[in-house]
From Swiss-Prot:
Main location: secreted
Classification via SMART domains: IFabd
Name of the protein in question: Interferon alpha-17
Gene that this sequence comes from: IFNA17
Signal peptide extent: 1-23
SUPFAM superfamilies recorded: 4-helical cytokines (SSF47266)
Subcellular location(s) per record: Secreted
GO cellular component term, pick one: extracellular region
Native source species: Homo sapiens
PROSITE patterns in alphabetical order: INTERFERON_A_B_D
CDD domains in the record: IFab
Amino acid sequence: MALSFSLLMAVLVLSYKSICSLGCDLPQTHSLGNRRALILLAQMGRISPFSCLKDRHDFGLPQEEFDGNQFQKTQAISVLHEMIQQTFNLFSTEDSSAAWEQSLLEKFSTELYQQLNNLEACVIQEVGMEETPLMNEDSILAVRKYFQRITLYLTEKKYSPCAWEVVRAEIMRSLSFSTNLQKILRRKD
């Protein structure tokens, strides 16, 4: 059964107040959340990746966007937020709901949602500390285009089990790259 959009919206509205009161503890909270998300994503695999080798695809992960040395902290947090938001959107679709074991999908979505809350709290806090623009628009656009390519691939492959397996592996890869960005952020603190 698809995740109820109205339920997700209710959770979003109810937790919005708490976002503003949270402090930014990104290095610990996001790193742990990212590890939990990776574990859940690994558990979601239903078919052997080896049976889907013919479906592999290069989605053009914008690796340079995960090189935190080129960003200020607020911009790096914004890139992380966009990546998690796009992942959440991808796995909140009806097609995604049909592809994965429901309890694992719900846990994964909940983990992503919590990471979004943490990142939003950090953006709110960091914007007050820095006079730089909130986002590096080119970086955000690169992340969005990356996810558009993933969505187009799924559509072209008619959301087949192998297509979802390839996407699952790709999202694990992108979450791993975001871990590198988090390490750089920790050094900047």
